[in-house]
């Protein structure tokens, strides 16, 4: 077999294949890490596919177990570039949420949470901020009657709105509101 120079067409094809292959091999940086810290929830939302309830069939994930995961992430990634999002169930069901948040923050990870706001009080919000809370997402699924129907609790709209107001009053605090659009909203 004779070594003939590759044609321009073949060289271009090989270069394209090499670049595509290199792109496939590049590591995609981790940007967000979700921690479902509990399966317990204080509401019974009609749209939720979770089997969360006030008393879960499984215990909450121990904080130490999640911190080990963060240690392994920090070994290969800059923690300041990975945002930890605490979800559930309802994260505010955890009595040690502030302790968990502080431990996450102390490891260099910014963190936020997704909440229905039912258990958010001014004092709890202050403690969460002191624990390094960067952001929060609050669920609000329509006006009072629709939201309360969707969430299965007559106080859920009022408490969610109060949580949103607290967050809006905090200078520089970043939060958002998510809505599950349905035929009642």
What are these language model-derived features?
Residues 2-135:
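Conserved alpha-helical substructure of the radical SAM core
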Residues 38, 148, 161-164:
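Residues within alpha-helical segments
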Residues 58-61, 65, 151-159:
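Alpha-helix N-cap and loop-to-helix initiation/capping positions
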Residues 163-185:
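Conserved strand-turn element in the central/C-terminal portion of the radical SAM core barrel
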């Amino acid at each position: 077999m004779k070594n003939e120079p590759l044609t321009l067409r073949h060289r271009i094809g090989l270069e394209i294949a090499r670049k595509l292959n290199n792109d496939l091999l590049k590591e995609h940086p981790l940007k967000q890490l979700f921690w479902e810290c509990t399966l317990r929830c204080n509401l019974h939302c009609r749209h939720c596919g979770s089997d969360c309830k006030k008393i879960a069939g499984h215990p909450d994930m121990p904080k130490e177990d999640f911190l080990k995961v963060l240690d392994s992430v920090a070994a290969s990634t800059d923690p300041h570039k990975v945002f930890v999002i605490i979800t559930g169930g309802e994260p505010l069901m955890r009595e040690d949420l502030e302790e968990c948040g502080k431990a996450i923050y102390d490891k260099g990870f910014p963190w936020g949470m997704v909440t229905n706001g039912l258990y958010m009080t001014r004092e709890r919000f202050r403690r969460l901020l002191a624990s390094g809370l960067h952001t929060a997402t609050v669920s609000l699924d329509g006006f009072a009657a629709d939201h309360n129907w969707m969430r299965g609790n007559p106080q859920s709209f009022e408490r969610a709105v109060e949580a949103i107001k607290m967050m809006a009053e905090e200078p520089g605090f970043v939060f958002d509101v998510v809505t599950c659009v349905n035929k009642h909203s």
